């Protein structure tokens, strides 16, 4: 089954027990449908909970929300830990929680997805590819570090040979580079081809991760101004994510106190508005600090 025929609404955490719908397009015959059902038990650490027919293909972003159960391990004093957790929850009921993007957006243990996105935004395709394939870090297994170092040293064939099974996306890119290297020196077109060898959701994830990185920075700076305090110029949204307008500062503050509305930070892009006043200057300074 071609990867291009598969669709899903969002990426899931790698190190978690997750459940989601995945669709496969063009499954018209009953024989094809049966073949999918027969895959049960053949995919590593994957169970099929239900196989049904649908009318439309699932696409990235068609996600209503996520629901989590969080497990905390290696607790010495359960009662004391529960007391601490409850005290924290009581405080959060008053202040709220900053809506940061988590580690899964940036990659773990190798946190580099946003760095690839940064290079893409700067139109440095060669560096974007290097940051994904090369750039070894001590957080990875030694064999992966050697494969990445071989790439940085310019040894594409050796890098491919050293890559572990888990480096399937890196292998896709290196194979494309090896193919283009046989035609001549690698140029921007070759690096573009390497990036296009990746699944489209992953290609989009790079720039999304960089947006998220900038957003997290802006959130941290906004939290420093007071997470549950209205600041003149804030763009305020209600719980339906509609912009709230024409309120006095006191009315805005009352909405925030009652969790009926929230201050925002920008998910940076070409059409995203900045806040006004001090908050807007802060949001612009985030961009300036990475140029």
Predicted regions located by residue number:
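Non-catalytic, substrate/partner-engaging modules appended to enzymatic cores
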Residues: 1-291
């Amino acid at each position: 089954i071609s990867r291009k025929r598969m669709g899903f609404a969002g990426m899931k955490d790698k190190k978690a027990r997750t459940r989601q719908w995945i669709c496969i397009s063009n499954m018209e015959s009953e024989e094809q449908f049966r073949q999918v059902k027969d895959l049960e038990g053949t995919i590593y650490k994957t169970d099929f909970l239900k196989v049904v027919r649908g009318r439309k293909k699932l696409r990235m972003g068609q996600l209503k929300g996520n629901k989590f159960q969080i497990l905390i391990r290696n607790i010495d004093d359960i009662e004391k830990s529960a007391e601490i957790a409850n005290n924290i929850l009581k405080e959060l009921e008053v202040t709220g929680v900053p809506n940061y993007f988590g580690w899964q957006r940036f990659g773990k243990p190798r946190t580099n997805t946003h760095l690839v996105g940064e290079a893409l935004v700067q139109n440095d395709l060669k560096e974007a590819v290097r940051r994904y394939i090369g750039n070894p870090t001590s957080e990875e297994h030694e064999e992966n570090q050697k494969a990445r170092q071989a790439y940085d040293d310019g040894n594409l064939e050796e890098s491919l040979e050293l890559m572990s099974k888990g480096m399937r996306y890196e292998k896709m890119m290196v194979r494309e580079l090896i193919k283009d290297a046989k035609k001549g020196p690698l140029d921007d077109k070759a690096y573009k081809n390497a990036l296009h060898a990746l699944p489209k959701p992953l290609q989009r994830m790079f720039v999304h991760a960089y947006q998220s990185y900038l957003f997290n920075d802006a959130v941290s700076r906004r939290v420093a101004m007071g997470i549950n305090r209205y600041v003149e110029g804030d763009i305020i949204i209600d719980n339906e994510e509609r912009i709230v307008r024409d309120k006095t500062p006191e009315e805005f503050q009352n909405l925030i106190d009652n969790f009926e509305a929230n201050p925002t930070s920008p998910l940076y892009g070409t059409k995203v508005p900045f806040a006004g006043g001090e908050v807007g200057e802060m949001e612009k300074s985030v961009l300036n600090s990475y140029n």
